[in-house]
Structures are given as structure tokens and as C-alpha cells.
Amino acid sequence: MQVTVRDLDGDDAGTLDLPRVFEEPVRPDLVKRAVLAAQANRTQEYGADEYAGLRTTAESQGSGRGMAHVPKANGQGARVPQTVGGRKAHPPKAEKDHGLDVNDKERKAAVRAAVAATTDSELVADRGHNFDDDVEFPLVVSDDFEDLVKTQDVVSLLEALGVHADIERADEGRTVRAGQGTLRGRKYQEPTSILFVTASESGPSTAARNLAGVDVATGREVNAEDLAPGAEPGRLTVWTESAVEEVAQR
């Protein structure tokens, strides 16, 4: 399978033989398992205070008084779950393991399947990405891209490739998050847009980090969640020639 390599002006800069990983069968089931496991394994432990609801002098009066055995303090029920300010019956435990296990072979197969999904224009469109009708997938650019340090240069490249509309979609879709996250440094929600896969992350990351919804990863470290956010394969991805060679070894 061959693909056209584009230069920084979007012009034809030759062809490249794609490795077999780009022809792997797309397995949404494996991709979903790998993504959900990655999300679960970075979940922060949480649980109730060991003494929550128990900091009271309430005592039960016992039997023989014609009244409930509920512990009371100053005539008010306390401590037990059915009282105001009492403990919870079965609170979350901080020692609980929320992680999920995935076999190594399945995890690697999920990455290969997610890589192959980036070659399917229908899957990319189904994820909601915007691009010109004449765009050919996968998108491969020359290694000159890795030398870019200015955001405007990246914007010019995306316009030449016919995929800048996806950046605009993500920018227009930015909304204020509902709930307590707005008070915890997560005020805005932003749609996911383009993923750049390169051999070196430093230069492209600096140039592209201010673009809405953009992520940068290396071919050696890109994972299933990078390629399939929300466990939906087919993310709009721009590869460099060197990154294609790196991902071939996955």
C-alpha cells in the first residue's frame, strides 16, 4: 500500500510504502477495551474518612424504654446511617482497585487496529471530523514538519492539506463544563481534533499546542487512547515519514 507524501506547502513530495500495521483489521472491540483500561488505571483512589459521622458522644439507651435503640445526643439521633449527619452504610473505600487488566497481545493489537483506522475516511468522518472531500488518508507529511516552531506555520500546513476546518470545529465547540469541575481547573470542555504523530515531540508540540483539540505524540509511544479518544477509532491523524517507520515496529 502506497501513500502520497506532502511537503509543507501541501504539494506532492513523493510516495511512501506503508508498513503492514496500516492494513491491520480494525477491531473496535479491542480498541474499546484498551481505552477503557487506560482510563480506569489512572483513576485516583477515593474513599470516605474512617471516622466520618462517628465524631459524636451519642449513646443508645438500650431496651426497656419503649423507644428505638438509635443512639442519641441531646435528644437527636446520631451516628447510624438513617440519622442526620450519621455515617454512610457502605461508603467508598480508598483501598479499592479500580484498574482493569488487558492482555499485552490485546493491547498491542488495539494500537495496531487504531492505527489502521486512521486510513479509513469513512471512520474519520463518522467520528465527526471535518475535512475537504479530496483529502486522501492516511495523511503523511515530510519530516520538515518536525522543525516547525510557529503555530502559524502549522495552520498554513493544515490549510494546504485541507483539514483546517477540523480545528475550527473544535474551537467553536468549546463550552463551559457543567458541575464542580469548573472550580477545579477544568472550566472548559473542548472537542478533540487532529493528532500529530511525529518522531520528535518537542518542536511540533510547541508549534501546535495552542490549536483547539490538537494532540502530539511520537510513533514510538502513541497509544490506543491517542488514536481513538472516547474509544471511537478513526481520529484525524497527520503522520510524518519518520513516525510511520517508528509505528511499523509496534
Curated annotation (Swiss-Prot):
GO annotation, cellular component aspect: cytosolic large ribosomal subunit
Role of this protein: One of the primary rRNA binding proteins, this protein initially binds near the 5'-end of the 23S rRNA. It is important during the early stages of 50S assembly. It makes multiple contacts with different domains of the 23S rRNA in the assembled 50S subunit and ribosome. Forms part of the polypeptide exit tunnel.
GO terms under biological process: translation
Protein name: Large ribosomal subunit protein uL4
Alphabetical keyword list: Ribonucleoprotein, Ribosomal protein, RNA-binding, rRNA-binding
GO molecular function: RNA binding; rRNA binding; structural constituent of ribosome
Biased segments, Basic and acidic residues type: 92-101
Assembly information from the UniProt record: Part of the 50S ribosomal subunit.
UniProt region (Disordered), positions on chain: 1-20, 51-101
Keyword Glycosyltransferase among record annotations: no
Family: Belongs to the universal ribosomal protein uL4 family.
Keyword match Kinase: no
Organism name: Halobacterium salinarum (strain ATCC 700922 / JCM 11081 / NRC-1) (Halobacterium halobium)
